[in-house]
A protein has these predicted regions:
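Short gly/ser-rich loop at a beta-strand->alpha-helix junction or flexible surface loop bordering the NTP-binding
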Residues: 1-117, 232-273
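Surface segments flanking catalytic/ligand-binding clefts of nucleic-acid enzymes
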Residues: 97-273
Length: 273
C-alpha cells in the first residue's frame, strides 16, 4: 500500500473499498482480484493495473491513517454507493455509524451534495442504524423491515431493575427477541454461556430465537414464519419479495458480485443484467 501511495498525486487519497478496509468497516463478500481505489481531482492519473483512480469534484479532503492518505469517511461512502447495491451500502453505513467514523450531521451534509452515489446513499440512510454490531445483524434487521416487521435493535430486557439480556432485535410490542448467531457462538464456552442466557430470558416469559447466515440468506421464510406467528398475523411468504430484491442486488449473492465487477468495468457486463 505504501508503494501505491507513493504513486498518487498530491491531493489524492484512498477511497471506495480500499478506504473502507483501512477504516475497518464491515463489507459484503467481495469478488477476488479487485484493485485498490484512490480519489483525486486532477485529470492526470497514475496508470497501474492494481490501482483504480476515481475522479471527484470538488477536490477530496485528505487525512493520514497509519501513514497513508485517505479521503473523508463521507467521500468513501459516496464512492461505494456509486457501485454497491443498496443492501451493501447499508451494511457499510451501519458500520461507519457504529464506529463513530461518520456522525449523523456529517452524513446529512453529504446527502445534500450533487455527487455520484448520493441517491443510493440517501436511500441507505433511511434504512441505516448504527446500533448494529455486525453485518449479519444489519441483514437480519433489514429482512424484518422488508417484511413489515417493526423491530428495535439492542433492546435491553430487564426484570426488577436487573439487566437480563440485551437482544439484537426486539419485535416491537411482543415478548420475542430475534438474534443473529455467528461463528463466535459455536465454541464450547460460548455455547454454555448462550444456554445460560437463554434460560435467563425464558425465566422472564420472553422468547429468544437465534438464526444463522443460512436462514438469513437461504431460508428467510423460516424467520418470517416465526415473526408472523409472534405477531399473530397470517403467514404470507410474498412479504419476502422486497427482501429478495435487496439480496439479489447485493454482493451477498454471486450474481451481485458479478454485477459489481461489471459496474466497475472489470467483468463481463452481460453476466449479471
Amino acid at each position: 500500500m505504501h508503494a501505491l501511495a507513493s504513486q498518487l498525486h498530491r491531493g489524492a487519497g484512498f477511497t471506495h473499498v480500499t478506504g473502507a478496509q483501512m477504516r475497518g468497516w464491515w463489507l459484503p463478500p467481495l469478488p477476488t482480484g479487485l484493485p485498490e481505489f484512490a480519489a483525486q481531482n486532477s485529470r492526470n492519473r497514475p496508470r497501474r493495473p492494481e490501482l483504480r483512480i476515481i475522479r471527484t469534484t470538488p477536490e477530496p479532503e485528505i487525512s493520514r491513517l497509519r501513514g497513508l492518505p485517505i479521503v473523508a469517511s463521507t467521500d468513501i461512502l459516496l464512492a461505494l454507493a456509486r457501485h454497491f447495491g443498496l443492501l451493501d451500502v447499508v451494511v457499510v453505513l451501519d458500520s461507519a455509524l457504529h464506529l463513530g467514523d461518520v456522525t449523523p450531521s456529517q452524513l446529512a451534509d453529504a446527502l445534500t451534495a450533487r455527487r455520484f452515489g448520493v441517491r443510493r446513499l440517501r436511500l441507505a440512510a433511511t434504512l441505516a442504524d448504527g446500533r448494529s454490531e455486525s453485518p449479519y445483524e444489519t441483514l437480519l434487521r433489514l429482512l424484518h423491515v422488508a417484511c413489515d416487521v417493526a423491530v428495535v435493535p439492542q433492546h435491553e430486557l430487564r426484570e426488577d431493575g436487573r439487566l437480563v439480556a440485551r437482544g439484537d432485535l426486539w419485535i416491537l410490542g411482543t415478548n420475542a427477541l430475534h438474534e443473529y448467531d455467528g461463528v463466535g457462538h459455536r465454541s464450547r464456552d460460548q455455547h454454555r454461556s448462550d444456554l445460560r442466557r437463554d434460560r435467563d430470558i425464558g425465566a422472564t416469559g420472553w422468547v429468544r430465537r437465534g438464526y444463522t447466515d443460512l436462514e438469513v440468506l437461504r431460508r428467510p421464510v423460516d424467520i418470517l414464519r416465526d415473526a408472523d406467528r409472534t405477531l399473530g398475523r397470517d403467514h404470507d411468504p410474498s412479504r419476502l419479495d422486497a427482501w429478495y430484491d435487496l439480496l439479489r442486488g447485493s454482493c451477498f449473492t454471486a450474481a451481485g458480485r458479478q454485477r459489481l465487477l461489471a459496474r466497475l468495468g472489470l467483468g463481463d457486463p452481460m453476466a449479471a443484467p
